[in-house]
């Protein structure tokens, strides 16, 4: 063996080169290690975690080598050698990725160890390893049986198994001794019983864990292991060649899931996972409200309930398809066993389904057939004979994956390749929904079972290209499969199609109001006059045409799915269209006969129809037309009837409903109960009445008279070439005036919604008791009832106790005891989080020794200054009666408690210290005198109050000495001296007859010596000073005596105050009663993680930016109190932290203030802490303890038993899984950041043993001689110093390739979650201990019977945004987000009933959702906003969502301008995609009218309204442009009749830009007012306006409108990573330009030109005040869009930064693009990417883009006629000449450009002459124009205004027709034209910034503006702006200093600018 290793060669046959290998070795070991300890030595243990994926099986061997290295280095060497040999056998050619490097590294390591390792037990390797194996077995396994935990035994058996494998390679079989063989057989026999487990060590022998001793677990295991009467699986004849292992596999099974696995071929990991899953579910459901005595088996009702939950969707599917359910229970069968078989089968299918989990009805189909097989196997042949009908054995454990899941996965994968990474149209490929909805039709049974892979579902014409040079993801083109039921067409018509009833209502209401307003009276009552009413009836004609439009859209947009539709559905579409067309013809015809004296078109119709039609036929037609609407209204008022009919599968009902609503599997019966219906109907009726009244009186009525005047006016003096000079009635003017008003009419419902939701939300919040305790003063005033409220709401009622109806003032000591345990833990967690200091902690704690005094001991912060005030009160008391003094003291509630407690505590402390009995007697007599004098009302006569202050001072000194260091020499003498002083003051200064007590003591002691007095009180017991509870008592008394008014502001931290007040307030809100821990619902938390920060490294903390600012330094300034508290904690001598521990604590302190995974995990793990505390409270319920958190220390066994029991119950109820998608890749990565993330995640697993990490493992495996990637879902836990694998489940392929990343990441890990509820928590969230305590209350919201028959399926929780203190932007976002997650969602849930799932931290009904497609949707692009689709899906499938505000979680938000814009763009993109989705269409069509309105205005309607707001500005200004350039406005305004009426000017000013800003702020003000007080809300509102919040929100309005509109027009949606940095930073001008050029700057400059033209050409006849009145809001919008990115950009106006930005922008503009040039390096690359959406848009998108670009031609057309050179000619020739001039200029520029390229090098002189000639020619032309033709300077500027937009139009058309221009050879010209325009725009925007940067005060003002909120929080930005921190002090030394040592060098010559580092 030794010779083999020393003379070994590499796999290439050459001897190893030692030096390079050493280098590589050191490099590899430094790349990362699994060990938490990081030794500095070069020689480090082999990192078993860096094994290449293709050699994964050798990793356990290397782990064992590392484990035993210290014990026996030689055996460890042999293990490594075995690993090397095995690796070489697995991959002899080293073809796998990383294999060659790893083998070389390992070989070098072996060569080194061969020389240095020595034998320890024998002289040869064979003997050495045998002896070690035997010793290891005897010392660890044999002795450990029954003593060690199952986890420890699992590791030992794993090591023993590997050692024996190594032993067999080292020792020949014949030389293995009997003892070793015997031990090896024992290991082999028992190792399966000691595998690593998740929660339940099901088959572990020996020491029992507490969780396995729970009776509910035992009963559940008994039920699952009931395999009686299950036939043994028999293998098919093809399996005759199975090896012995497989044969053994078929002979035995321990439970029903193993039996199912043997029958169907489920994977071992899947079986183990679902076995535990099922046992935990059964145990948790069964134990609820059950007596634990005689608990031996599961109740039948438990299994029945679980069956109902799991198979509700399956049974519904069977009924829908009218097929028999295969959940069959033959007579005489074991119903419970069969039920569990069905549940187990479903779970195993679901657990292995991978991406198919998103297709719930596909799973129903699979289960349907497999359940039929189970029934056939069990009951098909009662007497088994040869040749069974069903073959009962699967060939291997991957049979199900290979034969069922993988084929469906391959269909998904082929379809998603058609998507072309989001560039293909949705209609070109089938997504998850399309493939799932295939199973909504009975045609799905054509797939048969086993599935026929030649069926239509599997045959795909687009196979992967086999061309060698073609990329793997490309597909060849062929005939595609049709969409199923719905086609996601990219058009704005989707908004009308989905919400047609709303648009019809608005259009018909508008028509009605215009008709009524047109009446001369203008009164709304005019509708009752006959002629007006007759005209109003024309709305039905409009309705008919709108219905026709709807039917046409349905017909056209669904055409791509016709091949998948039933004939009845197609017929419905066609019939609907024909009926709509018929009404659109019939109603106008019948109306024409009803009109008296018809004219025009009506006369034509009337004469055509003839006289046989009676005049009232129109009335009959209307009655017939509205009949369906009347029936719909009746059904609306009877929701139960509609619900029954929609859910019915009876053919007659289906036929009746066929016309009203097409039959669909989902979206049936979504109607609410009557009271809910009344609430949201009332809300919308009130809103619509207000909206219509406002629209009528403010928008429509004022325009009617001016419209009539303009209608009758005749204009002849046009100022341009008018194409229709003889047109009557000025239609263009009327359109220009009415256009913006109509748009505002359609949009302002959104504003009314904001107003009404604010009012309703505020009222509902007030009735929900929100904000009743919002300050420390309020908390102190109500704290006396907080304990009873806590016990009433958050603790379960003891058995036999009635629920309290009212909270009374009396304080129950049991309440105080239970409350104190939770409260003190809450305070301690805040101390651990450094939110409070040690002193604040002591002031806030409720003492644990409550039984020592006769009164309730309140926290010292309530009793602050009560004792000093009482002393002053007593000293200055002038009365004679005791009663008056005590009445005065008792008038202050807490003062009485403080006085009594102080007295009794002083007594106990002094009495406890004394040893001498006579001394104790003196104290007893003093106390007796005090007590008896109080009882007899002679206290004032027996005691002098003037001596009390002196006594208080001595007591304070006494207590401080008691708490001082015990080691001091004079400690005892000091105590004795002060104690003697105290007794002397009491007896001589305070007591009138105190000397008598001392004299009696002398007499009783038998000693009358006069000097004996001096020897009293010398014998004291100092051992008490070491007693923790006694010291707590001393500390508390000292606080009572010394703390003054300063405690009123305790705690200092605003966050601590917020948490305390919110928790106390929530106790008075409505919430379900708390169940016992055993009775509560079990739940899991799931967090998806990709590559975000886990824990900041020391390097990241101390990395400086260019201004010398580090993260650490910044956080010290922004959180000064918390930093001070941290320093106090880590420097506490009692903790005795090492420097290494302090460095780790520092990393955690910083990370817990960022948006990191470690913060999230810490917050979620508070659930376990809360559960364990709740277990303790229930444990001590019968004998309520006044003690602390843990039972008495006297009985260690009881404490351990309790602790184990609490942990067992916590395991039973709570699971936390973090889905770290790329953890496996990070593990093997050589990049430092990936390795850091991996190590930090591992550290989290080790810190929190119950934390589980799931990841997607990517391995290279050899299949059929070829290496291919194989994917697994893996679950890990921390164990010892490494992670340990629990479950491994093979996947059909890469799961994240099919859908969006985050939902796929959640989906792969959801199988590892447990329980009945699932909380989704994002990576930027936090949680709080006190909120975790309410979790069992929240989960009761799912409980049956709380809301009748219908239970919620998603519980919405409120969030606290913790990033609001960084900057003003962060504050704006925090307020906006807070208002949405509170008042916004409050109204959505109640009364509107349209709350969905908006992200996290909502809680899902887990079983409901895993049987209906999961907790999100994942189809690429269309489900970009994956979270909200979970809410849509839940609602469509019969669930509903609630919202609860008595509990909250923390959440971080983006804090910089660009990050916020990225976020807004992402959400706008998502809403654009939602508009196209089938979910929105179905909800819009299937909700009743008022819920549909709620749904629209709270989802896609909000974004469409934002777009309409922007569009209104454009329509208004282009209308003005038309009026002013044509001369119509001048003619109309100068008309006498119009001039006298100011109504027109009022109409022109009716804009709504500010209204959406108001819409944003109003809910914020209401919510802040509710929770902080309306004075605070008003102050915040004013501050926000001063900080330009309106500018910010107006800017974001443009972001929403741009991205929403572009998504619907062209697509291009994508996930945008926003970044979660600490602070904002200075963004360069070029970066801002790239981000906002198209979304804001281009639009802003267009509006500037519009406003300038409108002003310039209307000045002569319009006053400037009128102009500003009309356009002020638009100028505000323009300013916001152009300059907001720079206003909110730190150091945006600092001169040096401005200079650098200009240089950077010029460089970027000048750089040429090309392949590989990124967009931030070259303008050309960016410009190309910016047009990406146009490359992939459809023909409709291109046509729309060109039509929109044509608007820019209007400027040139209008302005050229106003030039002086045109001399008022209005012929078309003028416009033609302007085009000739423009084209000439472009041609000359093109010639110069071509000349430069062709002649610039070889014919330089000639080129210069050419340019000179052109210049001279230009001068000549200009001279002629000025002198001869009358050209003026103003004409030049006007020409610029005219021709710039035209050039931009040419550019836009060129981009839309890119391929055409490229074919013509003009593309380079288009590009250069684009570059010229970018230069112009950049210069225009940059100039004001440069000018403002000249003035230093602008930069200072901007800093104040940005960081004012941080100033008020104590952020010393002025210091950061002024200089840098002390470079002499390295960050590692910060740990030893207090906050004050972190000063800044004040240097007047240092930086006067600042930007924060991120």
UniProtKB/Swiss-Prot annotation:
EC number: 2.4.1.34
InterPro entries (UniProt xref): FKS1-like_dom1 (IPR026899), Glyco_trans_48_dom (IPR003440), Vta1/CALS_N (IPR039431), Vta1/CALS_N_sf (IPR023175)
Topology class, membrane: Multi-pass membrane protein
Pfam families registered for this protein in UniProt: FKS1_dom1, Glucan_synthase, Vta1
Chief location bin: membrane
TM helices/strands, residue ranges: 505-525, 536-556, 570-590, 621-641, 674-694, 731-751, 1497-1517, 1548-1568, 1577-1597, 1641-1661, 1668-1688, 1743-1763, 1772-1792, 1813-1833, 1836-1856, 1879-1899
Topology Cytoplasmic: residue spans: 1-504, 557-569, 642-673, 752-1496, 1569-1576, 1662-1667, 1764-1771, 1834-1835, 1900-1958
Molecular functions per Gene Ontology: 1,3-beta-D-glucan synthase activity
GO CC term, one of those recorded: 1,3-beta-D-glucan synthase complex
One of the GO BP terms on file: callose deposition in phloem sieve plate
Region (Disordered): 1-29
Record topological domains on the Extracellular side: 526-535, 591-620, 695-730, 1518-1547, 1598-1640, 1689-1742, 1793-1812, 1857-1878
Catalytic activity entry: [(1->3)-beta-D-glucosyl](n) + UDP-alpha-D-glucose = [(1->3)-beta-D-glucosyl](n+1) + UDP + H(+)
Keywords: Cell membrane, Cell shape, Cell wall biogenesis/degradation, Glycosyltransferase, Membrane, Transferase, Transmembrane, Transmembrane helix
Family: Belongs to the glycosyltransferase 48 family.
Described purpose of this protein according to its UniProt entry: Involved in callose synthesis at the forming cell plate during cytokinesis. During plant growth and development, callose is found as a transitory component of the cell plate in dividing cells, is a major component of pollen mother cell walls and pollen tubes, and is found as a structural component of plasmodesmatal canals.
Annotated protein name in UniProt: Callose synthase 7
Taxonomic lineage of the native organism: Eukaryota, Viridiplantae, Streptophyta, Embryophyta, Tracheophyta
């Amino acid at each position: 063996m030794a010779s083999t290793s020393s003379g070994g060669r590499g796999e290439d046959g050459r001897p190893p080169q030692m030096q390079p290998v050493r280098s590589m070795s050191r490099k590899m070991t430094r790349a990362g290690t699994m060990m938490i300890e990081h030794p500095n030595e070069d020689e480090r243990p082999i990192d078993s975690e860096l094994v290449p994926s293709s050699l994964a099986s050798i990793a356990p061997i290397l782990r064992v080598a590392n484990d035993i290295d210290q014990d026996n280095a030689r055996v460890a060497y042999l293990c490594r050698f075995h690993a090397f040999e095995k690796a070489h056998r697995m991959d002899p050619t080293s073809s796998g990725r990383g294999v060659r490097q790893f083998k070389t590294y390992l070989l070098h390591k072996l060569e080194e160890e061969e020389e240095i390792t020595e034998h320890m037990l024998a002289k040869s390797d064979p003997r050495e390893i045998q002896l070690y194996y035997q010793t290891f077995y005897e010392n660890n396994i044999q002795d450990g049986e029954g003593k060690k935990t199952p986890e420890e035994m699992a590791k030992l058996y794993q090591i023993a198994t590997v050692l024996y494998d190594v032993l067999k390679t080292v020792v020949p079989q014949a030389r293995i001794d009997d003892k070793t063989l015997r031990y090896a057989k024992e290991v082999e026999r028992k190792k399966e019983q000691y595998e690593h487990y998740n929660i339940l060590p099901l088959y572990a022998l020996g020491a029992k864990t507490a969780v396995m001793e729970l009776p509910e677990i035992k009963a559940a295991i008994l039920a699952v292991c009931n395999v009686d009467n299950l036939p043994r699986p028999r293998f098919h004849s093809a399996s005759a060649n199975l090896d012995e292992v497989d044969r053994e596999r078929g002979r035995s099974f321990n439970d029903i899931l193993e039996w199912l696995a043997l029958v169907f071929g489920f994977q071992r990991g899947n079986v183990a996972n679902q076995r535990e899953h099922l046992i935990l579910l059964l145990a948790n459901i069964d134990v609820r409200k059950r007596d634990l005595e005689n608990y031996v088996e599961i109740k039948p009702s438990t299994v029945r309930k679980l069956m109902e939950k799991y198979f509700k969707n399956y049974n519904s599917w069977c009924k829908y398809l009218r097929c028999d359910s295969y959940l069959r229970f033959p007579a005489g069968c074991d119903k419970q066993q069969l039920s569990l078989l069905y549940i187990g089968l479903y779970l195993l299918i679901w657990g292995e389904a991978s991406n198919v989990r998103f297709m719930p009805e596909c799973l129903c189909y699979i289960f349907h057939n497999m359940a039929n097989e189970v029934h056939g196997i069990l009951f098909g042949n009662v007497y088994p004979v040869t040749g069974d009908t069903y073959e009962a054995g699967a060939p291997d454990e991957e049979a199900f994956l290979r034969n069922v899941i993988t084929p469906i996965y391959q269909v998904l994968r082929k379809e998603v390749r058609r998507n072309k990474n989001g560039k293909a149209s949705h209609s070109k490929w089938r997504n998850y929904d399309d493939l799932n909805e295939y199973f909504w039709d009975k045609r799905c049974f054509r797939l048969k079972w086993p599935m026929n892979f030649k069926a239509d579902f599997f045959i795909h014409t687009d196979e992967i290209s086999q061309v060698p040079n073609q990329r793997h993801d490309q597909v060849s083109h062929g005939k595609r499969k049709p969409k199923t039921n719905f086609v996601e067409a990219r058009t704005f018509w989707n908004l009308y199609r989905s919400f047609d009833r709303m648009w019809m209502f608005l259009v018909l209401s508008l028509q009605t109001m215009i008709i009524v307003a047109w009446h001369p009276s203008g009164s709304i009552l005019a509708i009752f006059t006959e002629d007006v009413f007759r005209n109003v009836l024309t709305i039905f004609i409009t309705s008919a045409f709108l219905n026709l439009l709807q039917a046409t859209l349905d017909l056209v947009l669904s055409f791509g799915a016709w091949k998948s539709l039933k004939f009845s559905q197609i017929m419905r579409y066609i019939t609907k269209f024909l009926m709509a067309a018929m009404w659109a013809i019939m109603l106008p015809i019948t109306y024409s006969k009803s009109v008296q004296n018809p004219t025009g078109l009506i006369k034509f119709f009337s004469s055509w129809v003839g006289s046989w039609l009676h005049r009232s036929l129109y009335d009959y037609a209307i009655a017939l037309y509205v009949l369906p609407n009347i029936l719909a209204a009746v059904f609306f008022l009877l929701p139960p009837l509609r619900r029954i009919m929609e859910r019915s599968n009876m053919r007659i009902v289906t036929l009746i409903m066929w016309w009203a609503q097409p039959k669909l599997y989902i979206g049936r019966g979504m109607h609410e109960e009557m009271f809910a219906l009344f609430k949201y109907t009332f809300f919308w009726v009130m809103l619509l009445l207000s909206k219509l009244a406002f629209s009528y009186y403010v928008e429509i009525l004022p325009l009617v008279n001016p419209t009539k005047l303009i209608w009758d006016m005749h204009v002849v003096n046009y100022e341009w070439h008018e194409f229709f000079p003889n047109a009557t009635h000025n239609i263009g003017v009327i359109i220009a005036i009415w256009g913006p008003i109509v748009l505002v009419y359609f949009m302002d419902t959104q504003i009314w919604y904001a107003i009404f939701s604010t009012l309703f939300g505020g009222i509902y919040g007030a009735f929900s008791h929100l904000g009743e305790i919002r300050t420390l003063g309020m908390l102190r005033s109500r704290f006396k009832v907080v304990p009873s409220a806590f016990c009433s709401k958050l603790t379960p009622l003891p058995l036999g106790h009635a629920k309290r109806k009212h909270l009374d003032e009396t304080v129950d000591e049991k309440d105080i005891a239970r409350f104190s345990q939770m409260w003190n833990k809450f305070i301690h967690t805040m101390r651990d989080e450094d939110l409070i200091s040690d002193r604040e902690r002591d002031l806030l704690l409720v003492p644990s020794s409550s039984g020592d005094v006769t009164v309730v001991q309140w926290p010292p912060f309530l009793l602050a200054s009560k004792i000093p005030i009482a002393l002053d009160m007593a000293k200055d008391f002038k009365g004679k009666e005791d009663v008056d003094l005590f009445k005065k003291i008792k008038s202050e509630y807490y003062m009485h408690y403080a006085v009594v407690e102080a007295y009794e505590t002083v007594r106990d402390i002094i009495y406890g210290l004394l040893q001498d009995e006579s001394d104790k007697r003196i104290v007893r007599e003093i106390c007796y005198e005090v007590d008896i004098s109080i009882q007899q009302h002679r206290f004032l006569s027996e005691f002098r109050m003037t001596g009390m202050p002196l006594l208080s001072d001595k007591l304070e000194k006494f207590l401080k000495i008691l708490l001082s260091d015990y080691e001091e020499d004079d400690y005892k003498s000091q105590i004795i001296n002060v104690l003697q002083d105290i007794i002397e003051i009491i007896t001589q200064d305070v007591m009138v007859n105190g000397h008598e007590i001392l004299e009696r003591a002398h007499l009783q002691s038998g000693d009358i010596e006069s000097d004996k007095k001096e020897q009293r009180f010398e014998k004291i017991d100092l051992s008490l000073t070491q007693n923790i509870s006694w010291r707590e008592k001393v500390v508390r008394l000292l606080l009572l005596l010394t703390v003054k008014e300063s405690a009123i502001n305790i705690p200092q931290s605003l966050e601590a105050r917020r948490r305390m007040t919110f928790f106390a307030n929530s106790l008075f809100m409505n919430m379900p009663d708390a169940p016992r821990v055993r009775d509560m619902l079990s739940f899991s938390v799931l967090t998806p993680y990709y590559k975000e920060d886990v824990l900041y490294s020391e390097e990241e903390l101390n990395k400086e930016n260019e201004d010398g600012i580090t993260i650490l330094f910044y956080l010290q300034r922004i959180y000064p109190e918390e930093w001070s508290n941290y320093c106090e904690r880590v420097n506490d001598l009692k903790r005795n932290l090492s420097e290494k521990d302090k460095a780790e604590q520092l990393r955690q302190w910083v990370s817990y203030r960022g948006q990191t995974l470690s913060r999230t995990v810490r917050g979620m793990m508070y659930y376990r802490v809360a559960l364990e505390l709740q277990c303790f409270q229930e444990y001590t319920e019968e004998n309520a303890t006044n003690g602390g958190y843990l039972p008495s220390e006297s009985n260690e066994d009881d404490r351990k038993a309790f602790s184990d029991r609490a942990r067992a119950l916590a395991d039973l109820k709570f699971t936390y899984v973090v889905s770290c998608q790329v953890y496996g890749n990070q593990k093997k990565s050589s990049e430092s950041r990936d390795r850091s993330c991996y190590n930090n995640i591992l550290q989290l697993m080790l810190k929190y043993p119950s934390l589980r990490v799931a990841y997607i493992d990517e391995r290279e495996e050899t299949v059929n001689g070829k290496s291919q990637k194989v994917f697994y879902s893996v679950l890990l836990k921390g164990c010892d110093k490494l992670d340990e694998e629990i479950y491994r489940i093979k996947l059909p392929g890469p799961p994240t390739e099919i859908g969006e990343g985050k939902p796929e990441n959640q989906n792969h890990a959801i199988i590892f979650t447990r329980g009945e509820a699932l909380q989704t928590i994002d990576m930027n969230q936090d949680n709080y201990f006190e909120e975790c305590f309410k979790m069992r209350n929240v989960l009761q919201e799912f409980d049956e019977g709380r809301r009748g028959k219908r239970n919620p399926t998603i519980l919405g929780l409120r969030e606290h945004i913790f990033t609001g203190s960084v900057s003003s932007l962060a504050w704006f976002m925090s307020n906006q987000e807070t208002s949405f997650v509170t008042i916004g969602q409050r109204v959505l849930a109640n009364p509107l009933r349209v709350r969905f799932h908006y992200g996290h931290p909502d809680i899902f009904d887990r079983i409901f959702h895993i049987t209906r497609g999961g907790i999100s949707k994942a189809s690429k692009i269309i489900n970009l906003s994956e979270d909200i689709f979970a809410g849509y899906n839940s609602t469509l499938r019969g669930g509903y969502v609630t919202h609860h505000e008595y509990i909250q979680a923390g959440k971080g938000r983006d804090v910089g301008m660009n990050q916020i814009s990225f976020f807004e763009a992402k959400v706008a993109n998502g809403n654009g995609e939602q508009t196209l989705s089938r979910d929105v269409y179905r909800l819009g069509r299937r909700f009743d009218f008022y819920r549909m309105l709620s749904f629209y205005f709270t989802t896609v309607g909000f974004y469409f309204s934002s777009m309409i707001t922007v569009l209104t500005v454009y329509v208004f200004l282009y209308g003005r442009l038309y009026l002013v350039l044509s001369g119509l406005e001048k003619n109309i305004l100068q008309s006498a009749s119009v001039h006298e009426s100011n109504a027109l000017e009022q109409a022109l000013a009716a804009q709504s830009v500010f209204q959406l800003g108001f819409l944003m702020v109003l809910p914020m003000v209401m919510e802040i007012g509710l929770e902080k007080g309306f004075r605070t809300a008003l102050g915040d509102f004013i501050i926000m306006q001063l900080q330009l919040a309106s500018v910010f929100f107006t800017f974001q309005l443009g972001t929403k409108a741009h991205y929403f509109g572009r998504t619907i027009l062209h697509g291009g949606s994508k996930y945008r990573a926003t970044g979660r940095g600490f602070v904002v930073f200075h963004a360069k001008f070029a970066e801002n330009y790239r981000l906002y050029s198209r979304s804001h700057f281009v639009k802003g400059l267009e509006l500037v030109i519009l406003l300038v033209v409108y002003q310039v050409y209307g000045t002569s006849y319009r006053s400037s005040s009128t102009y500003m009145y009309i356009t002020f809001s638009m100028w505000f919008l323009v300013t916001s869009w152009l300059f907001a990115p720079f206003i909110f950009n730190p150091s945006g106006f600092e001169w040096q930064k401005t200079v650098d930005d200009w240089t950077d922008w010029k460089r970027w503009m000048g750089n040429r693009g090309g392949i590989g040039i990124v967009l931030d390096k070259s303008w050309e690359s960016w410009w190309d990417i910016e047009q990406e959406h146009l490359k992939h848009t459809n023909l409709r998108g291109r046509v729309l883009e060109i039509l929109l670009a044509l608007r820019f031609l209007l400027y040139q057309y209008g302005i050229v006629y106003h030039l002086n050179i045109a001399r008022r000619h209005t012929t078309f020739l003028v416009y033609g000449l302007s085009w000739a001039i423009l084209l000439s200029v472009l041609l000359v520029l093109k010639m110069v450009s071509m000349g430069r390229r062709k002649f610039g090098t070889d014919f330089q002189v000639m080129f210069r002459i050419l340019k000179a000639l052109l210049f001279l020619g230009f001068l000549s032309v200009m001279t002629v124009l000025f002198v001869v033709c009358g050209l003026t300077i103003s004409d030049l500027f006007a020409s610029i205004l005219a021709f710039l937009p035209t050039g931009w139009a040419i550019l836009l058309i060129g981009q839309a027709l890119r391929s055409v221009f490229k074919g013509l050879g003009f593309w380079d010209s288009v590009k250069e034209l684009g570059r010229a325009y970018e230069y112009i725009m950049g210069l225009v925007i940059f100039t004001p910034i440069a000018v403002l940067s000249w003035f230093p005060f602008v930069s200072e003002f901007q800093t104040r503006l940005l960081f004012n909120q941080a100033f008020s929080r104590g952020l010393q930005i002025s210091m950061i702006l002024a200089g840098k921190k002390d470079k002499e002090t390295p960050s590692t030394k910060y740990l030893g200093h207090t906050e004050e040592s972190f000063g800044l060098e004040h240097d007047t010559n240092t930086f006067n600018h600042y930007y924060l580092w991120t």
